[in-house]
UniProtKB/Swiss-Prot annotation:
GO terms for cellular component: DNA-directed RNA polymerase complex. This is Probable DNA-directed RNA polymerase subunit delta. One of its GO terms (molecular function) is DNA-directed RNA polymerase activity. Belongs to the RpoE family. The gene is rpoE. Pfam families: HARE-HTH. It comes from Streptococcus thermophilus (strain ATCC BAA-491 / LMD-9). Residues 119-133, 143-191 have a biased composition (Acidic residues). Residues 14-83 form the HTH HARE-type domain.
Amino acid sequence: MELDVFAGQEKSELSMIEVARAILETRGRDKEMYFNDLVNEIQNYLEKSDADIRSALPFFYSDLNTDGSFIPLGDNKWGLRSWYAIDEIDEEVITLEDIDENAPKRKNKKVNAFMDGDEDAIDYNDDDPEDENFTPSSAILEYDNDNEDDENAEVESYDSELNEIIPDDDLDDVELSEEDDDDDYEDETND
């Protein structure tokens, strides 16, 4: 592939962003490209090795996002911003999102390398309540099904233990005032 824009220039002096812009311009409007295809064409044009491209890839992707002349169109497709009017950009993005919403969602299966088919091992990833298929454990279900009589019995036993410490009759006779507490504190600090 030859790009007329760079006629007479050294390929080694060209940046990947310049080449990407030129490739998209020569393809024309409505010929957006997947990121991988764009990188492959840049690599072929610049005649760079896989190692060189791999090392430059993070910087190229950052430049592609920050350069105002490129626009992501979803599904890792890229185009030139000049191809789209502002209103058309919003519509284009919305239509791509609408298409994605209608597509069935595929749930990623979690893989735990430490499980190794051991049935006795505990999989802590299965108890996330935010998962769509979460079912509460039996302990939670048992708690919800507790009898109220059991709870009342616990409260009564707790009250009886408190009555052993301070009988109910004595509670009415005791009056606390803040002054009494302060005086005791002052006496202790002066000693």
